[in-house]
Swiss-Prot record:
Pfam families: TPR_19, Wheel. It comes from Schizosaccharomyces pombe (strain 972 / ATCC 24843) (Fission yeast). The keyword Isomerase does not apply. One of its GO terms (molecular function) is Hsp90 protein binding. This is Hsp70/Hsp90 co-chaperone cns1. GO terms for cellular component: cytosol; nucleus.
Length: 358
């Protein structure tokens, strides 16, 4: 074709996608979208230095407007980080042009809304509203950020002010609906939290009253065991006369084993508890000595002595024994095969005497 010279197309170009082509063009000064992120190869590029100088040439409002326009171009092409940087550079000029500053603060808020930098969104929108108290987008973006931060009352006020300017705007109506739902859900959760917290306080006081009414002595040590969620409880949390339940540990001292039962009724007997625990033989009971009917149960006294607990009487009876104290809210019962109980008791007494000497 007249006036044009043919040239060979770089074969590597065919294998490049759009993003790679854009990155290549961005290294050419004329096409650059950012004058900062240019790589080492451009350090001595005279054309680039000239372009950098041009970017800041002119009156402050002209420089700011130039950066603003670059920001708008980047935003339109969804390069939000670059857009945010250009708006920041525009604002750094402090040009004093109200319209430019409003646009840059507002658009930077839009970028930060996408980045979920909600506090920066609020800061930028506040700058907009200082310059224009009727700026609908500033109220809208503030509301979006406040919803994300769960500051629902403030968000409602922003939407109200925004609606005064654009009462039928679909985005505002949708945000208002979203806010109402989230606000209602939040209030329900907070109400439930308060209810649960109040019940816990009432339950704790009622448990203390229930223990007192049953004449059960209690003691809390400096380092109580971690029982997880298990605790003394009542079948009706605010009724001290309702059924009382205790975390209970069964200790098998002859085999150094134990079973923890999170909740045992005060009316449960040791035999009933043992039958529940030993429904299936324990893997450590290789000699099958732990048959509920052939086991003896003991509780410790305040002086570290032992009392035998009847297997067919409620556990409450052991807890109300004048020499027994409920320690750290945990019922502790020692379980020993009947034919070995005598020797174990002798060993217990011997250890107690030796500890007393020391």
């Amino acid at each position: 074709m007249a006036g044009f010279q043919s040239s060979e197309v770089d074969p590597n170009t065919k294998n490049k996608n759009a993003e790679e082509m854009f990155n290549e063009l961005n290294k050419v000064p004329f096409f650059m979208q950012s004058l900062e992120d240019v790589g080492d190869e451009s350090e001595n590029n005279v054309q680039l230095d000239a372009l950098k100088a041009l970017a800041y040439e002119g009156e402050p409002h002209e420089v700011a407007q130039n950066f603003r326009e670059h920001g708008n171009e980047c935003f339109a092409s969804k390069r939000y980080k670059d857009a945010e940087e250009f708006y920041t550079k525009a604002l750094a000029q402090k040009c004093g042009d109200k319209d430019i500053e409003i646009a840059c603060y507002s658009n930077r808020a839009a970028c930060n809304l996408l980045f979920e930098n909600y506090r920066q969104v609020l800061n930028d929108c506040a700058q907009v509203l200082q310059r224009d108290s009727t700026h609908a987008k500033a109220y809208y973006r503030s509301a979006k950020a406040l919803v994300a931060l769960k500051r629902y009352d403030e968000a409602k006020e922003c939407i109200r002010l925004c609606s005064l300017v654009h009462p039928n705007d679909p985005a505002i109506l949708a945000l208002s609906k979203e806010l109402q739902k989230k606000s209602d859900d939040f209030e329900k959760r907070e109400s439930e939290k308060k209810r649960v917290a109040q019940e816990k306080v009432i339950a704790a006081k009622t448990v203390l009253l229930a223990l007192q009414e049953r004449h059960i002595k209690t003691k809390t040590t400096e380092h109580p065991p971690d029982l997880g969620d298990a605790m003394i409880s009542l079948s009706t949390f605010d009724d001290p006369k309702s059924e009382l339940f205790f975390p209970t540990i069964l200790l098998y001292p002859l085999v150094y084993q134990s079973d923890f039962v999170p909740s045992v009724s005060e009316n449960c007997t040791p035999l009933e508890l043992l039958k529940t625990v030993f429904q299936s033989p324990a893997p450590w009971d290789v000699h099958q000595l732990y048959n509920p009917d052939s086991l003896d149960v003991f509780a410790t006294t305040d002086t570290l002595g032992l009392i035998k607990v009847g297997k067919n009487v409620p556990i409450l009876k052991a807890l109300t024994h004048p020499k027994v104290t409920l320690i750290d809210g945990l019922v502790q019962l020692h379980v020993v095969p009947h034919h070995l109980a005598s020797d174990w008791i002798s060993s217990w007494k011997k250890n107690k005497q030796e500890n007393a000497k020391n």
